[in-house]
């Protein structure tokens, strides 16, 4: 079965997941909706400062995108209800504008003819969140779902492994996060987040994040046990989670590493990675794993208290799991 998808919003995540979708034989992108001119959409897809040039032939013909001879419909429509997904027999819409984050607004895609909707970020209401490595097995056919955030996708698989083996009592997370498109290049007005308005190239910026709390939604056993903060740093891509955690079952740091390594090779293969190399952030650029445990970067204070470090490409890794969720919802 070929899954026909439409992408609403062709920003960083929209473009990265489009690239990844080209490598999946069972997924076909048949439509893109964005307010940009089609020629500019083609340009932004072709050239990427972080991930390099797009490897396939791109052209624009009659306001449609042509990739290796295959036509992709381009529209510039603000109201999702007018997108006419039914005319293209769309199975799943990927909602990546960051604007339609409630059931009522996302449901407009259903009214337009889409069968399912996957939101690329945490919702603003009770839209269920599904994270690979945490709760994909709980999906029951819901029409509108969220893939949570990139940080939740990093933290949840690691937290599940630790909780399953050692029993998490409580934990604090810090994500050291690469800059994103919502930040300001130089100091600019930001009424809701004063610090967030400061220049992204000049500063390490403390920020709030709901990623750790969201883990409790996809892993109910951890509800109320985790919270966290973020620091935005002047890098283009790749972020890292620092999970400082207290657990019930005594274990040395080496024993924890062994458990994570085994999980990365078995149950969590393709989701959770493991490395003992002397790595830095750019070494993870382009990695589709959503959480890569860095054994040499962490440590423990005693047998019940440890600091665990896990890297993630906040664009590629996350986009890869969005497509995994698309496959899940399309087949149920």
From Swiss-Prot:
Reactions listed under catalytic activity: D-glyceraldehyde 3-phosphate + phosphate + NAD(+) = (2R)-3-phospho-glyceroyl phosphate + NADH + H(+)
What gene codes for this chain? gapA
- Major localisation: cytoplasm
Q: Which domain of life is it from?
A: Bacteria
Q: Which GO terms describe its cellular component?
A: cytoplasm
Q: In which pathway does it act?
A: Carbohydrate degradation; glycolysis; pyruvate from D-glyceraldehyde 3-phosphate: step 1/5
Keyword match Transmembrane = no
Where do the annotations place D-glyceraldehyde 3-phosphate binding?
149-151, 180, 209-210, 232
EC number assigned by the record = 1.2.1.12
Keywords assigned by UniProt? Cytoplasm, Glycolysis, NAD, Nucleotide-binding, Oxidoreductase
Q: What is the lineage of its organism?
A: Bacteria, Pseudomonadati, Pseudomonadota, Gammaproteobacteria, Enterobacterales
Q: What class of enzyme is it?
A: oxidoreductase
Recorded source organism is: Buchnera aphidicola subsp. Schizaphis graminum (strain Sg)
Keyword Signal attached: no
What start-end ranges are recorded for coiled-coil regions in this protein? none
Q: What does this protein do?
A: Catalyzes the oxidative phosphorylation of glyceraldehyde 3-phosphate (G3P) to 1,3-bisphosphoglycerate (BPG) using the cofactor NAD. The first reaction step involves the formation of a hemiacetal intermediate between G3P and a cysteine residue, and this hemiacetal intermediate is then oxidized to a thioester, with concomitant reduction of NAD to NADH. The reduced NADH is then exchanged with the second NAD, and the thioester is attacked by a nucleophilic inorganic phosphate to produce BPG.
Please report the name of this protein according to its UniProt entry. Glyceraldehyde-3-phosphate dehydrogenase
List, alphabetically, the InterPro entries matched.
GlycerAld/Erythrose_P_DH, GlycerAld_3-P_DH_AS, GlycerAld_3-P_DH_cat, GlycerAld_3-P_DH_NAD(P)-bd, Glyceraldehyde-3-P_DH_1, NAD(P)-bd_dom_sf
* Residue numbers marked as site, Activates thiol group during catalysis: 177
